[in-house]
């Protein structure tokens, strides 16, 4: 029997409904902040991700799904969303002054060839938000504020921690890297980190194998310029004044090379294991690196698989919330098919949800089916109802019933 590829999932019935509810709620939150949706292709040129994410990252060096098309062009399935959005902004000239600040979001499948495990898949879904054209501290605040609002709106406050850092740039970055290299030279590093040490030493701090041994990492804070330090302090003060509790982490660098300035990760503590659920920050140089356009930018990404797993653990009310329909009709005789269809069409015409048993079931089985759908009203139609155009509407909430006619039913609906 043919089966789905390893690291992928099928979504159906209650699981698909839960995903739909989560995505709808996320879009409602982003609409409150005036973000609009953007959709980009499922695959892009390989060069886009090499230039944006960085050639030394695990994503580019190990995890991309690559293929060559019939014109010998190197393409990849999207491993993340930001680079695609930046490409779209440049190609479609969305950086025009009248569009700024440009605030967009996407919910899209991504693809990475990594070992499948709990909450991590080779095809996964990501919510991302991106803001272009604003270098304001208030914009950094808004991005993290949206992330915390998502956590709060889904009632996931338990075991949540927010970590922040400020990545230095320019000459000070070079000085810090020299100090970091000196510090790391005393450790026995994994093979990947030995490569990173030469190409991008900051990435060593993001290693899942070696990071536990780095206890006294040189602090980036000691190398920030006065301007950078002031900006970071003002950002943290804004969080403090609005009761957003954050923890500074010198080892936080993010797994993508394009980040500069303020960065953050929101982590969930699960059985003494911290899982990142939302992460992002500022990447002011990325648009310039891809399209030679100076445009400030910031944003975040959130893996929906892991997020929904946490919802299942903490928010049972959303998981167990039944999707009600307004009317369920049970047609037990072919003579009542026309009447049944008239009732359904009229109900749906005014925006109500209605369904029926379109195949022959015993009355007992049909009533069981109705119970699963949790309708407000149930109508049973047989040959007598078809002849008289009279039928009984059962109110499932108030446990009452009334007899009515098709004419009166139409009038009551209107």
Swiss-Prot record:
HAMAP family reported for this sequence: His_tRNA_synth
The species this protein was found in: Mycoplasma mycoides subsp. mycoides SC (strain CCUG 32753 / NCTC 10114 / PG1)
GO terms assigned for molecular function: ATP binding; histidine-tRNA ligase activity
CDD domains in UniProt: HisRS-like_core (cd00773)
GO biological process: histidyl-tRNA aminoacylation
Family: Belongs to the class-II aminoacyl-tRNA synthetase family.
A GO CC term assigned to this protein in UniProt: cytoplasm
Catalyzed reaction equations: tRNA(His) + L-histidine + ATP = L-histidyl-tRNA(His) + AMP + diphosphate + H(+)
Entry protein name: Histidine--tRNA ligase
Pfam families noted in UniProt: tRNA-synt_His
Annotated Gene3D superfamilies: Anticodon-binding domain (3.40.50.800), Bira Bifunctional Protein, Domain 2 (3.30.930.10)
Annotated localization: Cytoplasm
Subunit relationships: Homodimer.
Enzyme kind, highest EC tier: ligase
Listed EC numbers: 6.1.1.21
Keywords: Aminoacyl-tRNA synthetase, ATP-binding, Cytoplasm, Ligase, Nucleotide-binding, Protein biosynthesis
Primary location class: cytoplasm
């Amino acid at each position: 029997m043919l089966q789905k590829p390893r690291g992928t999932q099928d979504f159906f019935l209650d699981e698909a409904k839960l995903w739909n509810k989560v995505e709808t709620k996320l879009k409602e939150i982003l609409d409150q902040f005036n973000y609009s949706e953007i959709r980009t292709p499922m695959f892009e040129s390989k060069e886009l991700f090499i230039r944006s994410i960085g050639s030394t990252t695990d994503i580019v060096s190990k995890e991309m799904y690559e293929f060559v098309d019939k014109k010998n062009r190197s393409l990849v399935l999207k491993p993340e969303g930001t680079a695609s959005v930046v490409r779209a902004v440049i190609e479609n000239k969305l950086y025009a002054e009248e569009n700024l600040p440009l605030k967009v979001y996407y919910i899209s499948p991504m693809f990475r060839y990594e070992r499948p495990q709990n909450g991590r898949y080779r095809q996964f879904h990501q919510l991302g938000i991106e803001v272009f054209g604003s270098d304001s501290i208030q914009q950094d605040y808004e991005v993290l504020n949206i992330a915390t609002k998502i956590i709060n709106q889904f009632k996931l406050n338990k075991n949540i921690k927010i970590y922040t850092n400020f990545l230095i740039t320019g000459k000070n970055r070079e000085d810090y890297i020299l100090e970091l290299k000196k510090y790391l030279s005393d450790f026995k590093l994994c093979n990947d980190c030995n490569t990173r040490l030469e190409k991008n030493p900051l990435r060593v701090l993001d290693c899942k194998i070696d990071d536990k041994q780095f206890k006294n990492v040189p602090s980036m804070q000691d190398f920030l310029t006065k301007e950078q330090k002031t900006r970071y302090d003002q950002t943290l003060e804004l969080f403090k004044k609005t009761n957003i509790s954050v923890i500074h982490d010198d080892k936080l660098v993010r797994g993508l090379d394009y980040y500069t300035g303020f960065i953050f990760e929101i982590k969930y503590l699960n059985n003494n294991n911290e899982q990142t659920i939302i992460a992002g920050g500022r990447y002011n140089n990325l648009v310039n690196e891809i399209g030679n356009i100076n445009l400030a930018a910031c944003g975040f990404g959130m893996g929906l698989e892991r997020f929904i797993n946490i919802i299942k653990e903490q928010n049972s009310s959303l998981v167990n919330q039944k999707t009600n329909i307004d009317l369920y009709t049970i047609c037990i005789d072919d003579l009542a098919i026309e009447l049944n269809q008239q009732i359904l069409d009229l109900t749906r015409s005014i925006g109500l949800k209605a369904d029926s048993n379109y195949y022959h079931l015993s009355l007992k089985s049909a009533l069981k089916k109705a119970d699963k759908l949790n309708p407000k009203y149930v109508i049973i139609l047989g040959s007598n109802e078809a002849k008289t155009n009279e039928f009984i509407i059962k109110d499932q909430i108030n446990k009452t019933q009334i007899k009515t006619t098709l004419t009166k039913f139409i009038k009551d609906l209107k």
